[in-house]
Amino acid sequence: MNDKERKPWVTASDVAARAGVSRSAVSRAFSPTASIAPQTRERVMAAARALGYQVNLIARDMITQRSSMIGVVTAGFENPFRARLLSDLMAALGQRALTPLVTNAEDPRQVRQSLEQLLSYRIAGLVMTSASPPLSVAQQYLEHRIPVVMINREANLPGADVVVSDNAAGAVQAAQRLVRAGARRLAFVGPRGASYSARSRAAAFEQALGRGDAFGATLARVLDTPSDTHASGIDAARQLFAASERPDGVFCSSDLLALGVIDVARSEFGLRVPDDLCVIGFDDIPAAEYDAYRLTTLRQDTRGLAHAAIDLLADRMQTFDGPSRTRVVPVAQVVRDSCA
């Protein structure tokens, strides 16, 4: 199709003419917070649908001097938990008529450049779901008075708000569940050095075992992995079960790690789950339900995390100044066959 054949864009003036309203009424109809009679809004929307009208967000933001674009920084798109969280974030932003600009923080060499590029879009806020971007980059946004909300990251950036899952409560529940199942030599597996969430879960798990919640169980091994992937779980399991005294209960900081541990325990060491080994994960990804695993886990409420984050962001977009706030979202224990 050449330029002469390309269908011209429908304008707000076209919609106004068809609906029999003013141009400004069309603008108000597409602004969720604007004052406009319901019947007028519906007439405008009907005309827009009939004509195939789409709001020019860039033009609207330039006119109003208020951006509707929100930067979302994430990593590990192949990770089922992060994919679900990203989906819920998109939905939460859409409910507030905000437009996400997603940046992949997987490659540390490109993170800073990508984050700095977001500044050129004059975004209205930033949501960080990955541990990869350095806080110094997020600090740049705060200096431009752009709100920053971090999900499952440590609350150590003044002015930024944080939403986290209740890692401590989940870890204590994992310790208690393992002990009730009869496990006595326990191990923790997770990327403590690279992940705030794994670090928090490991610390709470260790504290639970040390203060009497464990009823005689001991923490035999804490294994720091490079990541929270299935491959890291495989490597960790080989180290754990090659030792002279194997653990009989393992708490993993993610479900993917737990699935890797189970695979190796069965295929390479002939262990039966849960008869010889109890395993608990964290996240409740779809694979945790598979018959091959039936993984007991702690479910993170991705919808709750997403909505809490966007609520904080929207509030900060209205009133930027104020102390940092932290919201803790409960987790839910899901009991399946791997540790009943």
Identify what each model region corresponds to.
Residues 185, 217-220, 271-276:
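Short acidic capping loops at alpha-helix termini that bridge into adjacent secondary structure
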Residues 111-122, 232-245:
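Short, well-structured alpha-helical segments in soluble
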